[in-house]
Amino acid sequence: MVDKIIFTVTPIFSIPPRGAVAVETWMYQVAQRTNFPNRIVCIKNPGYSNYTFVNDNCSIHRVGFSRIYKRLFQKWTRLDPLPYSQRILNIAHDFPITKESVIVVHNSMKLYTQIRKRAPQARVVIHMHNAFEPKLLEQNVKMIVPSLYLKKYYQSYLANADIEIVPRLAP
């Protein structure tokens, strides 16, 4: 039984999005309707606060990177001392998560792999909204997909994966 969820996505758009951003919009809609405690962790774009209270069960935590940090650690040296994946885990640790808590990574195999490496004991699920070749995923991955097509697609690569279909319903 799941008692808490951390929703996260690639560090491109802040949540709630100010434009047509399907994955981020879907995640925001689901998180605010979920009946148990959850957190959304996303990147902090200009004009957004670090934290937003949504309701009693949901809040948004935005991770910011300074221009100097991005330039020095992410572009020049590629030696990122506190990457996005670790910042997500720090927020999860402050939640505090339990053995029943789940981190749901949306549409990013790279981010999923980074979180798994940094927290192998954590219950991490990847929610794939698109068909990408799963080169970075382990064979026994736990995955959520929105369609039978995607379930069959990923099962053709990952025979031992635990894949569940959760259809996308219009908010």
Task: Mark where each language-model region is.
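N-terminal strand-loop element at the rim of the active site
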Residues: V9-P17, R33-W76
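Structural motif
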Residues: K4, S101-V102, K142
